[in-house]
């Protein structure tokens, strides 16, 4: 993968290039750019599709603690590096967290948003102790003992094996001396700020996609985003889909994304 050095971080990314409008996909926690493979294949004939690995994920190392505001700055700087003035920002879960913050930071750079299984608020306090336990077990023993639980939250049954291999390879790369690569992204997730009260400042068009069986973020939280945004919002429920609906239900998600993108004004 090519690497862009921005904000003191070497960011791994992919870029289909071409002359079409740019769409930048940002992945969820514990995932990487490959979670959008089906979207890249579907959109590439008409759009310039960019994916990237965020700090502490995939091929991108974190140099220290960071927030989703830093990640928003990263995606905007990556756009600068690639000569992209304006783009649709598409994000799954934490990818949506940073995409919303990018829209707040530089509204003139964000043509539209695609928010997949995401939210604007804080983590549910009822889930926090369990997530802390999972993180600690992952640090101490690797993903093996908890990967089935994690996969069931993100993917639901039946699509686990490929991600098991990814998680174990990543852990082996960092253990035992560089496990802060796991902790810094986790703390970013758990300690993030609540931007629900600022949603009205986001006035670009938005597509909100959410799985009806999302065990990580209830659909009601996506409805809160829809209702709070200051611009036109299209809301699509993906029937039966878990947290990573673009991975498990790519046909439905791709159809909705293409319909939304094709309906945007030029520019």
Predicted segments, located by residue:
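Flexible "cap/lid" loop of the alpha/beta hydrolase fold
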Residues: 100, 104-105, 110-141
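Acidic catalytic loop of the alpha/beta-hydrolase fold
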Residues: 213-217
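Catalytic histidine neighborhood in serine/cysteine hydrolases
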Residues: 223-244
